[in-house]
Every structure is written in C-alpha cells, then in structure tokens.
C-alpha cells in the first residue's frame, strides 16, 4: 500500500507524542518492513524542521527529524503544476490541498492523517492509521504495495 503520511502523523512519531506515538511507531515499522511505502510532500520537510526545532529548541534534533524522514520516506515533488491543481481544488486549507494534489499526482492509495476534516473533499481516500491497519488486514490486501 502506497500512502501519503500527513505531517501530524509523522510528527507523532518523530516527537514521540504520547497519545499517538504507538500507532505512529507501528506505521514506521510497517514502512521499514516494506508492507507500506510512505510518502511525504517536499513541503512537509520544512514544516517538520520548523516544528521540531520549536518543540525541542534544538537545531540538531530538527535536522535529525528531517534526516529520519528522508531515510524512511519517498518524497512527492511539489512543482508548479501540483501547486496550481491544489489552488484550484476548492479545499479550504492550501497545505492540505497540496498534499491531496501530490497524492493524486503520485497515484497513491490513501492519505494517512489524524485530521480527516482537513481533507473532506479529497479525491484520494483519507484514513487514520488504525483504518489503514484494517485495510491491510483484509484478506485480499495481505501485502499489496
């Protein structure tokens, strides 16, 4: 299964956010094992650096968060065409619209997020991490990538 990982889920793992870390850690284990191919947008990397630096007050830890993301994830390019599709999409949040446009451009199976409200009119299925597990556990999806 090829999925775009929303920034909030990625930060749950990188910053070990207590309420959400266990699901995020399981997701990263599935990525490491090849059961899931994780994607992030190029713009997510700048968000990760900024938020991790603000949260940890450490440039080195922010750099480590970006490095871990670059190691584990495929990067969806954000070019003019993606930005224009996102802008004309009608989604209220431009950042979320960029993620949807990237997922469409890459032909991804789903977007994983804790903020499904931001993706209400997405043409790509929007799932929580737990919903993703349920799909993977379905008999006909035992290991589709």
Residue ranges of predicted features:
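Active-site neighborhoods of divalent-metal-dependent phosphate/nucleic-acid chemistry enzymes
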Residues: 74-116, 143-145
């Amino acid at each position: 299964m090829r999925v775009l990982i929303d920034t909030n889920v990625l930060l749950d793992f990188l910053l070990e956010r207590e309420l959400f870390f266990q699901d995020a850690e399981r997701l990263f284990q599935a990525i490491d094992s090849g059961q899931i191919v994780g994607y992030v947008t190029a713009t997510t990397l700048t968000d990760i650096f900024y938020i991790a630096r603000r949260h940890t007050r450490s440039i080195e830890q922010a750099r480590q968060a970006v490095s871990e993301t670059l190691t584990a994830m495929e990067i969806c390019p954000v070019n003019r065409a993606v930005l224009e599709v996102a802008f004309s999409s009608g989604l209220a949040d431009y950042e979320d619209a960029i993620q949807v446009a990237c997922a469409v451009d890459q032909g991804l199976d789903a977007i994983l997020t804790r903020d499904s409200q931001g993706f209400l009119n997405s043409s790509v299925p929007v799932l929580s991490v737990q919903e993703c597990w349920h799909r993977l556990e379905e008999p006909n999806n035992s290991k589709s990538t």
